[in-house]
A protein has these predicted regions:
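Glycine/Thr-rich phosphate-binding loops that ligate phosphate moieties of nucleotide
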Residues: 1-30, 37, 70-113, 169, ...
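Gly/Ser/Thr-rich active-site cleft segment
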Residues: 9-11, 22, 119-237, 292, ...
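N-terminal phosphate-binding loop and adjacent alpha-helix
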Residues: 29-67
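Gly-rich Lys/Arg/Thr-decorated short loops/hinges at beta-loop-alpha junctions or inter-strand turns
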Residues: 33-44, 118-121, 171-178, 359-366
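Phosphate/pyrophosphate-binding loops at sites that engage ATP/ADP/AMP, CoA/4′-phosphopantetheine
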Residues: 54-70, 142-148, 163, 192-202, ...
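Conserved glycosyltransferase catalytic-site signature
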Residues: 77, 133-136, 157-158, 234-239, ...
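A polyampholytic, Gly/Pro-enriched intrinsically disordered region
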Residues: 112-128, 226-233, 251-253, 440-454
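ATP-dependent carbohydrate kinase catalytic cores
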Residues: 175-288, 292, 298-302, 315-324, ...
Length: 489
């Protein structure tokens, strides 16, 4: 039996995942790591703690499967940047996380200086603190790291690849590179002009390789043993698109995680920039890039965590579905979870969270339902922008991620979108996608048709009939969203 392992280094923890050649999950191990908030709007991770979580989960997984491992894939939270010393292999500071807002003013300055069009046309992205470039610039400008020949920057995948191979491989894949704000997605290389704009030396950036192919082999110091090929890498959302078998243009998925990320396969031609959306590289199987349109929603699952940890409305995240279903509607309450501003399609870093419509009759259930509905409303906003850009509505949305277990959410989502929402049997599609990219490179699967065959439906949610009522709810949501915008000076 061929076994492929995937390391999924997310925003709040690491999952290591094993599957066989039929695409069936064999084992899963998970380890959380600490979130650091040193200043308002700042979010950091300890790279060593992430690496230790990887070692722990790989060791636990290895004990469970007792089979030789054919390949390893890596998928990761994107945009988050690690700086380390190539000589010692040690991090130079905490990683700056994708949610971090410390470079908001710098992004505003670059907008005022007229750099948006150059950035947009070259990278497919926007000037926003979400992306990696201004984080690296901040580290250099504030002398947190010293610019010398030993300096290495990388997204989480590069850091883990370095550690897995004991420093013999310093690389990333094209999907992660395309999220840095430094990569020319049409010419497929680091942009010298953009690197110069941010004062970032190209020598401190990793080699960019296809998403499926040999990146290196594990060293004897890893918890899983030496000589195992690391043969697939993709950013978490692109990996989920692949794991959902969205391999044809127009196929669309949404991952409900800390945030939610809607991606549509755009084919082999790089699409023009679309209002409110990002153009990104989905993957490269060795024959050139496949592109995607993306809508990035910053806060969805994190809002459920806030109900639990911030307000104490629920004790466990799993309670929210029953609590939201305990009331027939939201009671006029709308919640805009703009904790870190708004992402697609609004891109407003000055927006802040808003709860509106509270009365003396508002109950815990109404607040819970407003949180669940906010996930669906934000997704609808992105999908409508995506349909306008593509010139055609989507036909189906495939879903995954932690909140996809909530039938109530998926039914509300189908009602708001007016299309079928399909949940697969395996909802760990982020990890599954990276494993499949690695397995393709090592011959576990010989063609993408086998990836299609591995996707299996668990449950479909078709839209219910009251379209006018759903549109009215969405219009009220947009009114609430407007109240949240441009709050911070």
């Amino acid at each position: 039996m061929a076994v492929v392992v995937s390391i999924d280094a997310g925003t709040t923890g690491v999952r290591s995942f094993a599957l066989d050649e039929t695409g069936q999950q064999l084992a899963l191990s998970y380890q959380e790591f600490t979130q650091h908030y040193p200043n308002p709007g700042w979010v950091e991770h300890d790279p060593t703690e992430i690496w230790n979580a990887v070692k722990f989960t790989l060791s636990e997984l290895n004990d469970r499967i007792n089979e030789p491992i054919a390949a390893i894939g890596i998928t990761n939270q994107r945009e988050t940047v690690v700086a380390w010393d190539r000589k010692t292999g040690e991090p130079l500071c905490n990683a700056i996380v994708w949610q971090d807002l410390r470079t908001s003013d710098r992004c505003e300055q670059l907008l005022e200086l007229g750099h948006l069009d150059q950035i947009r046309q070259t990278t497919g992205l926007l000037l926003n603190p979400y992306f990696t470039a201004t984080k690296i610039e901040w580290l250099l400008h504030n002398n947190v790291v010293e610019n010398n020949s030993n300096l290495a920057f990388g997204t989480i995948d590069s850091w883990l690849l370095w550690k897995l191979t004991d420093g013999s491989s310093y690389a990333t894949d094209v999907s992660n590179a395309s999220r840095t704000l430094l990569y020319d997605i049409k010419e497929n290389h680091w942009s010298s002009e953009i690197c110069e704009l941010f004062g970032i030396p190209e020598s401190a950036l990793p080699e960019v390789l296809p998403s499926s192919g040999r990146f290196g082999t594990t060293s004897a110091t890893t918890a899983i043993g030496a000589g195992i090929p690391v043969s697939g890498i993709a950013g978490d959302q692109q990996s989920a698109l692949f794991g959902q078998a969205c391999l044809e243009p127009g196929m669309t998925k949404n991952t409900y995680g800390t945030g939610s990320f809607v991606l549509m396969n755009a084919g082999s031609e790089c699409p023009d920039p679309a209002e409110g959306l990002l153009t990104t590289v989905a993957w490269d199987l060795g024959n050139g890039p496949t592109y995607a349109l993306e809508g990035s929603i910053f806060v969805t699952g994190a809002a459920i965590q806030w109900l639990r940890d911030g307000l104490g409305v629920i004790s466990h995240a799993s309670e929210i579905s029953d609590l939201a279903a305990s009331v027939p509607d939201n009671g006029g309450v709308f919640f805009v979870p703009a904790f870190a501003g708004l992402g697609s399609p609004w891109w407003d870093t000055r927006a802040r969270g808003t709860i509106i419509g509270i009365t003396g009759g508002t109950q815990r259930g109404h607040l819970a339902r407003a949180v669940v509905e906010a996930i669906a409303f934000q997704t609808r906003d992105v999908v409508e922008a995506m349909s306008r850009a593509a010139g055609t509505p989507i036909g189906e949305m495939r879903v995954d991620g932690g909140a996809s277990v909530m039938d109530l959410l998926l039914q509300i989502q189908a009602n708001q979108l007016g299309v079928r929402v399909a949940r697969p049997i395996i909802t760990e599609t982020t990890a599954q996608g990276a494993a499949m990219l690695a397995g393709l490179a090592e011959g576990v699967w010989s063609e993408t048709g086998e990836i299609h065959s591995a996707w299996r439906l668990d449950k479909a949610f078709d839209p219910q009939s009251d379209r006018k009522a759903y549109d009215t709810e969405h219009e009220r949501w947009l009114q609430a969203l407007d109240r949240s915008r441009f709050w911070v000076d």
